[in-house]
Amino acid sequence: MSENKQALQVAALKNGTVIDHIPSEKLFTVVSLLGLEHMTTNITIGFNLDSKKLGKKGIIKIADKFFCDEEINRISVVAPHVKLNIIRDYEVVEKKEVRMPDELKAIVKCANPKCITNNEPMATLFHVIDKDNCVIKCHYCEKEQKREDITII
């Protein structure tokens, strides 16, 4: 391990996944969306770290965990420009950018109080209409919602 890696604000990771460029105010929402509180491996969370792009950012380092695209893309609703680094033996072997999926299942609450998903025990399902601006439409009642109106379940 080189000298400069020891000077990082958050310790280097031998193997696992680094989720970087998380807006600080969304960090704990991302933790919840990924279910990290249920994991047994080492997890390092950096909050309000200095960032040239964001001013302040969050970072999550998860030891020995490699997420599938479907797991990671869930966070695109709250943090659309997050970067993933896959680490093996202290080296970045792959970089990924979070992409919004075509559908969001059981992640978002429908804003329509009359929607069946708010009145029956069933999972929500939304179709993504506009990935750039995060506009989604409920599969059941067809109500559209924008990012600022979205409530995460």
Swiss-Prot record:
Residues annotated as signal peptide: none
Record has Zinc as a keyword: yes
The name this protein goes by in its record: Aspartate carbamoyltransferase regulatory chain
Family the UniProt entry places it in: Belongs to the PyrI family.
Keyword Metal-binding part of the UniProt annotation: yes
Cofactor dependency: Zn(2+)
Organism: Bacteroides fragilis (strain ATCC 25285 / DSM 2151 / CCUG 4856 / JCM 11019 / LMG 10263 / NCTC 9343 / Onslow / VPI 2553 / EN-2)
One GO MF term: metal ion binding
GO annotation, cellular component aspect: aspartate carbamoyltransferase complex
Biological function: Involved in allosteric regulation of aspartate carbamoyltransferase.
Domain of life: Bacteria
